[in-house]
C-alpha cells in the first residue's frame, strides 16, 4: 500500500459524501472538504499507510468514521441551542494549531510544558473546538467555558483496567468517548489513585483516547512506562506526547525516562532531544 493507493481507497470509501478532494503530492496529504461551504479536514496519507501495515482495514475504517463525523459537524448551523453540559476540555500537544484555518484564534490554556487545554462543544459522536468567533453565539465568556468544561469532565465515569508488570501497577482509562486524555484534569480522580500508590505515581497522555497512570514500585517500571507511552503515542490518531509526568499532590512534572531503569527531570538537553524526536516524527507523518 502506497500513498496513491490509500488516496484512491479513501476517495472510494467516502464517495457517499457531498465533498471534493484535493491531493497534495509533495506533502502526501488529502484534503476533504464540503462543497457547500468549503470547510473540511486534511489527512496525512503517509501516516495512515504506515499504520495500515499493522492495522490493515481497521485503520481505514477509523479514518472513514472520523471523516464522516467531522464533515457532518462542519455544516453551517446555529450554536445558540448548545447547553452548558456540552462544553468539554480536550488535551492537545503544545505544538497544536493556535488558530483555525480561517485564522481565528482557538480558546485554549497552557497546561504543562508538553500539553495545552483546548475547549470544545460536544456533538455526540464528535466535537468542535471552540474559537473566539463562537463566543457570541454561545453567549459565554472564556472564563465560563473553562469552569463549565472542568465541571463536566469531573462528571465523566473514570472506569479503568489494571495490569501488573514486574511488580508495577498500570491503570488504563480508555473509554473512547473522546475525553480519555482530558481526565488528567480531574484532580480528585488522580488524588484517589495517588492514595492507592505504593511507589512513585506517573501519568501519561500519549494520545487523545487514553490516560495511563502508573504506580512505579521498582526501576523496571520506568522502562515499561517509557515503552507504553511511545507505543501509544505512535499509534494514536491524535498524538499528544510520549513524555510521562510525575504526579504528587496535584502537581504534574514532565520527566524523561532515559532507559535501563533511569529517569531524568526536564532539563535543556532533554528538551532538545525531545524536540528533535518530535520534529522527526511529525516529518515522517
UniProtKB/Swiss-Prot annotation:
It comes from Staphylococcus aureus (strain bovine RF122 / ET3-1). Pfam families: DUF1444. InterPro entries: DUF1444. Belongs to the UPF0354 family. NCBIfam families: PRK13668.1. It comes from the Bacteria. This is UPF0354 protein SAB1603c.
